[in-house]
């Protein structure tokens, strides 16, 4: 057991939150906060008890200056209000270092295929929302490395993910709501690589409370071997960032540099769609990303990327690149038509289905499958249905929803047949979605319905619209 403290010092990453209560704190309380902060994160020796207020040479002043420089504050060495405010913000508890860094000793996984297991669930969210947040967090890192992940439902996985309160068996007890958020361990056997989340926090899938996806993505960075970054835009920056719009999330180049220093870039794979080296240059008729009146024909995912179709073009949005790329549909799939009506991905089949008029095509990567196009009526639609407005596949339930005017049908992907009892009214089961739907797709556990230049973020579990956004927010507008 004598080696355990050293092991934990090297491997544990504890996320701590210091809530701002808005009340004035006494000087002694502030000094105690600063003392502990500098001890925990900037290696201030614990026997340094007196703060030097007038000399720039004091050890505490030096550490304050170091902290201010690292976190992007004005470097004064003084305990101004900005410095104290930052010290109280949610953050990870591992010491701060410059730029991206790995843990001491540079621990990393010696294999590229890793397993994970969700041991238990928080009552704050439906199980499928937790599953989706974790899957998306893993995908953040999978997109930019050779790493792949698969889920185990029993036994020991490389990354064990669990929710717990207070003492939970790893010598780092949680402390109730508002302080420690989560902690994760660097790569290695046993507890190493695992991520624990404080179940006294209010976990959410949106921008209220503590967003599970954002915290999980950060913690998994630690599970893969990353330390902290001084880059304020980085996911691995020590302070917790709550986004007002999750559609704008992207991995910073600093994070990419860090993880690729451990594992390298993603390999070229025959399973990955072939990409033209350059997006199409602007020309007459090319849609402008940030046109306030921009609407979309169809939206789908494809192996972790987002495809947004408009006329004869489509945007490709990937975590690997900061900006979405615009391409001609014909440059990927020469036999597909322009101006498609609907698109959706069935991840279990590794297929994307594209609809136009009374026909549909199946694509896998950059290949249109043989035997297509087929008529939409082979799916079980009545002759009165001439086209599909929008479609989305719920991967947790293995059901696909087809939207046609003010009604919708549901298709069972396992049985490969339309379910009885449909169509139903969209407004009854999707309250708040009362306009004609141009496109729809799923991300972050939400359904995003596009109508003209607007989109509605819909929570399928709560059955309500949670946000109204511009359609082109996915294009960084």
Curated annotation (Swiss-Prot):
Residues 276-285 have a biased composition (Pro residues). Keywords: Calcium, Collagen degradation, Cytoplasm, Disulfide bond, Extracellular matrix, Hydrolase, Immunity, Innate immunity, Metal-binding, Metalloprotease, Nucleus, Protease, Repeat, Secreted, Signal, Zinc, Zymogen. Binds 4 Ca(2+) ions per subunit. Binds 2 Zn(2+) ions per subunit. Residues 18-99 form a propeptide. It catalyses: Preferential cleavage where P1', P2' and P3' are hydrophobic residues. Its main location: secreted. Disulfide bonds join 290-477. Its cofactor is Ca(2+); Zn(2+). GO terms for biological process: cellular response to amino acid stimulus; cellular response to lipopolysaccharide; cellular response to nitric oxide; cellular response to reactive oxygen species; cellular response to UV-A; collagen catabolic process; extracellular matrix disassembly; extracellular matrix organization. This is Stromelysin-1. The gene is MMP3.
